């Protein structure tokens, strides 16, 4: 029997880095992993779908206190921040109440959102839930992704497509998508669409090209983002250029 591995996990430590970046003694690791899961779940439930592409968690220690820094990558800055940062501050209060620790949230804007698998998958799932015809949705998503400059894309949808009595599988692929080439920068995401006919599964696989030796995904992808920060003593916004090269899998 053929065994399929997750393309994101298969490349960890080779061309991809972890989304949780911290170290601790072995006894605390299970507790901290569970805490990270709670934080990610709370953030995903706090905002609508097709909003956040990745959540990065970093743990820092200052004297005896632990400080958590969370980086949110999004294509919709206005929704994340809200009027006068109300949404952002509300999220900070919820997380601090949940884990009883101080946190800081940094927001990075993703410009080329059609290149990110999780955002493409969530957008397809939302349209399917709104009863859009699945073939038109797939065709539109692939055309937009290819125009953004990717090397290849594959989309797989399974379930009762179009309300059919029998579940089936439909896939569309364009370009090159080498899943077994470890140097290939493959972005993979899975999302569910809850319709009146049942649950549809949506898988999106995007190829950004090959990562050369001694290089990382940051050198391959051209998804730039800007950081929006409000200083305490200065009301002006500060923009910091940064490459967004990581994605999350749901």
Swiss-Prot record:
Q: Which UniProt keywords apply?
A: Ribonucleoprotein, Ribosomal protein, RNA-binding, rRNA-binding
Transmembrane portions of the chain: none
- Extract the Pfam families matched here: Ribosomal_S3_C
Q: Name one GO cellular component term.
A: cytosolic small ribosomal subunit
PROSITE patterns this protein is in? Answer: KH_TYPE_2 (PS50823), RIBOSOMAL_S3 (PS00548)
Question: Is Ribosomal protein tagged as a keyword?
Answer: yes
Q: Which GO terms describe its biological process?
A: translation
The residue ranges of the KH type-2 domain are 39-111
A GO MF label: structural constituent of ribosome
Q: What does this protein do?
A: Binds the lower part of the 30S subunit head. Binds mRNA in the 70S ribosome, positioning it for translation.
PANTHER family in the record: 30S/40S RIBOSOMAL PROTEIN S3, SMALL RIBOSOMAL SUBUNIT PROTEIN US3C
How does this protein assemble? Part of the 30S ribosomal subunit. Forms a tight complex with proteins S10 and S14.
What does the similarity note say? Belongs to the universal ribosomal protein uS3 family.
Family annotation (NCBIfam families): rpsC_bact (TIGR01009)
- Its recorded name reads Small ribosomal subunit protein uS3
Q: Which organism is it from?
A: Elm witches'-broom phytoplasma
């Amino acid at each position: 029997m053929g065994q399929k591995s997750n393309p994101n996990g298969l490349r960890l430590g080779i061309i991809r880095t972890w989304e949780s970046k911290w170290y601790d003694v072995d006894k605390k690791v299970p507790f901290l992993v569970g805490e990270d899961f709670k934080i990610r779940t709370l953030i995903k439930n706090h905002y609508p779908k097709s909003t956040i592409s990745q959540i990065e968690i970093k743990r820092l220690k200052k004297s005896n206190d632990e400080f958590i820094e969370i980086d949110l990558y999004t294509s919709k800055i206005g929704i994340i921040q809200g009027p006068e940062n109300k949404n952002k501050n509300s999220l900070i209060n919820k997380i601090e109440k949940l884990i009883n620790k101080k946190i800081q949230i940094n927001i990075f804007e993703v410009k080329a959102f059609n290149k990110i698998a999780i955002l493409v998958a969530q957008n397809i799932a939302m349209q399917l839930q709104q009863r859009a015809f699945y073939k038109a949705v797939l065709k539109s998503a692939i055309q937009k992704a290819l125009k953004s400059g990717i090397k290849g894309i594959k989309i797989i949808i399974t379930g009762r497509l179009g309300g059919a009595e029998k579940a089936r599988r439909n896939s569309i692929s364009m370009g090159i998508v080498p899943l077994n080439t470890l140097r290939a920068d493959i972005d993979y995401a899975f999302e569910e669409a809850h319709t009146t006919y049942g649950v549809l599964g949506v898988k999106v696989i995007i190829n950004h090209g090959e990562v050369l030796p001694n290089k990382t995904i940051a050198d391959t992808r051209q998804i730039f983002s800007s950081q929006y920060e409000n200083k305490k003593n200065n009301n002006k916004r500060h923009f910091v250029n940064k490459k967004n090269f990581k994605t999350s899998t749901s």
